[in-house]
Regions:
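DNA replication initiation on ssDNA origins
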Residues: 1-74, 82-92
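Active-site palm subdomain of RNA-directed nucleic acid polymerases
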Residues: 94-106
Length: 162
């Protein structure tokens, strides 16, 4: 399974995002009781061992989709509603089915939704970003919604959004 996962979620391999639960600034949310990590870049190679640790639940990582050639094999629209109680995931699934979109909806850890698109080979990141941004109005999302960023600089200086 690890090899297949790496094929789907391949991207920038020189660093990866890390949810650091052991960081001194990590804390426990008093309302939910959940431990809140510090999110940071880990400037080490993204190896099969790191992927495997993520799949085993030992690490929580984030992968920069863009490789060094500004190409991607996957993209994600990350939907995090303000209120999770009334969040209608079926609305998004219905739109995907209605328009026969090449998206796979996956529930996120927080209870939101990731709308994932996968390519068989690395593809120009700007084209994929444009495609995903053009879908936002269908889902009644604005451009402030999060989706993957094209790699315009080092991972430590990326910009959120479009």
């Amino acid at each position: 399974m690890e090899k297949r996962y790496i094929e789907f979620f391949d991207g920038y391999r020189q660093a990866y995002g890390l949810a650091d639960f052991e960081h001194p600034e990590a804390y426990t949310d008093p309302d939910s009781g959940k431990k809140k990590p510090v999110y940071r870049w880990n400037f080490e190679k993204l190896t099969a061992q790191v992927y495997n640790s993520h799949l085993k639940g030992e690490l929580s990582i984030g992968i920069q989709p863009c490789n060094e050639n500004k190409e991607v094999k996957f993209g994600v629209i990350d939907i995090d509603p303000k209120e999770y109680d009334d969040f209608d995931k079926k609305f998004f699934i219905d739109i995907i089915q209605q328009y026969d979109l090449p998206l796979i909806p996956v529930e996120s850890k927080s209870g939101g939704l990731h709308l994932c698109i996968f390519m068989n080979s690395f593809t120009d990141a700007k084209s994929v970003k444009s495609f995903l941004s053009n879908l936002l109005p269908l889902f009644k999302l604005n451009l402030i919604a999060k989706y993957f960023q094209s790699k315009q600089s080092s991972p430590g200086t990326r910009k959120q959004g479009t």
